[in-house]
Structures are given as C-alpha cells and as structure tokens.
C-alpha cells in the first residue's frame, strides 16, 4: 500500500492510496468461487455452477463490494500509519485501475489540535445561597395557592382573584382579529395579558361594563398590532375569590405525607428545595466557566461534527412535536447551526481539559448523581437499580460526571469571587422568572 497525504483546506485532508491490483483480483476470485459453491441456479447441480456463470450474473456487484471493503480497510490502515484522527466518515472516490495497482482517494476532516488558552483569565462569580425557614414557608404558601378553591363574591375584583368576562377589542374604532372573547377566564396578577389589561379590571364588580385603554407592546407577535393603542369594551360577569387550604396535617396529606404530618411535609419540601438549589448553583457556575472557556479559545470546527450535531438537534425538535410530524417539511439546518457549532466547540474544549488533566469519571460521583436524580422519584432504590443495570444510561452519567470534574479543574485556575444571594432571588433568575 502506498499513501500520500494532502492538506486541502482547513481541517480537510485528502489521502491518495494505491493497493496492488492482484490483491483485489484475488479477493474477487475467492468471492466468486464461494458464491459458486452455494448458488442455486436452474440447470446446474448445487455447488457445481461454473464460476464464469457466477461472474456473468454477479461479478459486477461482487467487484463493487470487494472494492468498497478494500478502500475501507486500507483507509483505516493509512490513517493509523499517518497518525490522522478523522472527525467524520470519509468520502471515497475510486480512481484508476491498471494491471499493477488500484488507486483511490479518501477525503475527510480531522479533529483540530486544541491548545487551551486563557484559563487563568476566566472570571466566575460563585453564588452562595441556602434554604431558610422563610423560604420553606414561602414554598408552602405557593402550594396553598396551587390548591386553592374559588367561589363567587359580591365585591370589587382584587389581585389574585379569578374573573369571568366578555370583551371586544378595537384599534382606531375597528375590531381586530382575535380581540373578542366570551366567558373568558383570567386570574388577576398572572401576567397573561398585555400590560394594563389586568390592572384595568381591578376595582370593578360583576355586572359592570367598562372600557380600558391599553397599548400593545412593540414586540407583540401580531405585526398589525405592534405598538398600537387599543380599547377593550369589557363586561365583567363574575368575580371569584380564592379560598386557601389551612396549613395542617390534612394539607400535608394532599402531597402523600401520611406519617409525620406538617413537619414531615416541611422536611420533604426543604430536601427538594436543597436539591434544586444545588443543581442550579452547579449549573450557574458551569455556565460561567464554559462562557469564559469559549471566549478565550477560538478553534476551527470540523463541519462533519457540526452537521452531526445539527441532525441531533433537528431530531430532538421534531420529537417535541410528538406524532404531528408526518406531513411536516424537514426543519432547515440553519435553525440549528449556531447552537450545534457551540455544542461541538464546548465538547472539543472540555475533551482537551479532560485529556490534559487525565480525568476519569469517579464512581462515587457517578453514584451520587444517580442518587440525587433518583431522590425525586417515589421509589429511589428502583430508579438507582435501573440506571446501574443500563449501560447506555450509566455512560450518560459518566459523561455528566466527567463534565463536572472538568469544570472543577477549570475553576482551580479561574478568578473566583463568592457572592451571597437569597434563595428566592437566585432561583427566580435561574428559572427565568426574574
């Protein structure tokens, strides 16, 4: 086998490989003979079909298969010999064939050489938060509201009430599409409607008819309504006030707490809040570390890896539509290219961190991650056993553990400052509610 390597552009490489023609001819001959022994062709006894007949019928297909196998095998031998690391499947182009040699070209991309830079310039503001008694009480109040019952009242509508209404919206005296509704239910303070709409209902009683003036936001989804002043003629048909359940052992039973009553519920709530806080704190620090790593390291990305990641993201997006994808056109790659490139870059950089620091997934950490995830389920031991018996899930957890270890390695050289934050403030920002 003879090999020449050419760097074409960027990460692309072109291998020109020559193999002795007799190697292919021998493989073709052997394959034809094997086929002759097992072929069943009318007019010939089993195992007695002449090779010339087999060659006439199947020769072209057999030669094509053998050629493909030869190219694949010699390509692998060539990249090992040349110490090349392909970042995707090669494209084979069969070339000239004469009595002495068969030549073909393999084109592919290689992984970039990654040299980590600016690790000591990464800046991280590490939040410090804890779950207080007041935070637990606030969560219980939220749970009370979620389990509230509503009853009609003969008073003015207030924040937190549910109301029923009929309304007709107009712009410049003309009704607009989607601006009319009957028996419309709305919880005041939910923020579901455009600014000013809910506030305009406060202080009104059931049976009242009134008009409120509002302005559609400039970023409103309907082009014809962006930034427009509008009037809504409203007939308020019902005002309902919330009746919150008392906080006692019966309240605890609503959440499956059958022993220990209210104190057991508070313990469970605190445990869940601590778990969510720990996950959010880790995610916040990781996000900052990754952002710094990306900002300080510019590397060339193999298109093959980006294309592969685009396909993964596209598939995930299609799955979110459930069974409604049969008649949908394929989502364009451009929708996912930027996110895919970012994910590929993160993977390559973290891979280099893992390699440089000789990191291996710590078993104790892996089991800790599984236990933390399983604690959210009714029977954690069953979930833990399921993960430990599933190779794919365990590999996913090892990858998560390795990422954590890589982030921790980067933190050692980063500029880290600690900042005390309140639980509610931090979690609102983490979940996008701030």
UniProtKB/Swiss-Prot annotation:
GO terms for biological process: 'de novo' cotranslational protein folding; cell division; chaperone-mediated protein folding; protein transport; protein unfolding. Coiled coil: none annotated. Residues 160-245 form the PPIase FKBP-type domain. The keyword Isomerase applies. The keyword Hydrolase does not apply. Pfam families: FKBP_C, Trigger_C, Trigger_N. Keywords: Cell cycle, Cell division, Chaperone, Cytoplasm, Isomerase, Rotamase. It is found in: Cytoplasm. GO terms for molecular function: peptidyl-prolyl cis-trans isomerase activity; protein folding chaperone; ribosome binding. It catalyses: [protein]-peptidylproline (omega=180) = [protein]-peptidylproline (omega=0). InterPro entries: PPIase_dom_sf, PPIase_FKBP_dom, Trig_fac, Trigger_fac_C, Trigger_fac_C_sf, Trigger_fac_ribosome-bd_bac, Trigger_fac_ribosome-bd_sf, Trigger_fact/SurA_dom_sf. It is an enzyme of class 5 (isomerase). GO terms for cellular component: cytoplasm. Its EC number is 5.2.1.8. Belongs to the FKBP-type PPIase family. Tig subfamily. Involved in protein export. Acts as a chaperone by maintaining the newly synthesized protein in an open conformation. Functions as a peptidyl-prolyl cis-trans isomerase. NCBIfam families: tig (TIGR00115). Consists of 3 domains; the N-terminus binds the ribosome, the middle domain has PPIase activity, while the C-terminus has intrinsic chaperone activity on its own. This is Trigger factor. The lineage of its organism: Bacteria, Pseudomonadati, Pseudomonadota, Gammaproteobacteria, Alteromonadales.
